[in-house]
């Protein structure tokens, strides 16, 4: 396909899909029933607030209908597993499961799932705290499972203590996930997946969520675990205003590892205004990075995100053997600080392709990003990294010494600023920027060198400490000092190549046509 970079249009379409796709009006009764549950209740009672039910077992016997609401008494613990099977409500009268009185009710499911929705529609789970027995102390399941459902809302949920994912959305569509705190789980905080080889998980919106301290699945000895937010075999996904931190540190194996926020075998994903920091991997393990566009990802964008102090690279660009083709993805207006010093990549950006087929790994636009690393390199190419159509424009690359590791092949670098903290410039053993540009025909437009080798006058580099996406708009550490001309020495990507930059910079200010770096 032609690379037209129409991601603003894509974003608007995805929002329409997520909030409106598949909806239909249904005529139902004007009112539903209410059911109350309290530790002081009795399952033989009426289920009213005055005479509440007591146990989850009672809830599982109810045949809920459109408009019904289930209330659990806040700050009380209810033992067991909620299972709702094949119940369909309606757009205007959803079924709601929530808390009443002060605080959130706690569902303690021990070694099993806490809440499972199977083949259901129009159900909302709001203001509930779910806990398992712990990823190493008895639990072997996911926390909340949305299985083959549509039009589901998960809002204001705290989920912890599950060996697999805190929240698992499987083969479902039109799911709104908001304000979920997923922590102290095994495989992942939040996991979204369709069936293998299918994209039958679709129109998922993850907003204002956090995935923290999900260390790894002790039972998974063959693949990665300890992810923050992960999406695969899916399409039309938005992950925004969310955070992943301190995940992956107890993955029980070496080999491919976890990442803070990432997707694989996915089409039309937008990851934006997110923070991924201090994520880890096992000793000797791979990955442990901030963000990742992995095998089989297509038509996807990462924008306005901050990655810092991850053991793995801030941005992984990966294709693995056996995945669908990887193509037409964009990484723009992001910042990586001090990433990749522990994992084998040793760089802020890591590019890898185990398929060794350039036709399977092509067309990436990487522009207006800042990669700052006082410890290791800016970009690393694995010895297996064959690809085509990768273009890097208007970025600022700052590294400890070596700026580039490995061989970039036929990648295009144009309009970037390069700076080595130790040697001013070092790429492929060449210590002179102009000599490197002429040797490899890089950073040239119409035979003229358009790249730069200037120390960027950042405001407060190397000191990121923001932890909330709401703080990103005022994060000025990598905004070039006021009135510095370097900020406007990039290329006009629209005039030259027809690339629309989306109109916004990292900090949501207007992105100038010739802007260099991420913040303005």
How should these model regions be labeled?
Residues 94, 98-103, 121-132, 150-161, ...:
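Right-handed parallel beta-helix
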Residues 57, 62-66, 77-96, 105-152, ...:
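Extracellular beta-strand-rich solenoid/capping regions of secreted or surface-exposed proteins
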Residues 430-520:
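Surface beta-loop-beta hairpin patches that serve as ligand-binding interfaces in beta-rich domains
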Residues 34-73, 77-79, 83, 111-114, ...:
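Acidic Gly/Asp/Thr-rich repetitive segments characteristic of extracellular carbohydrate-active
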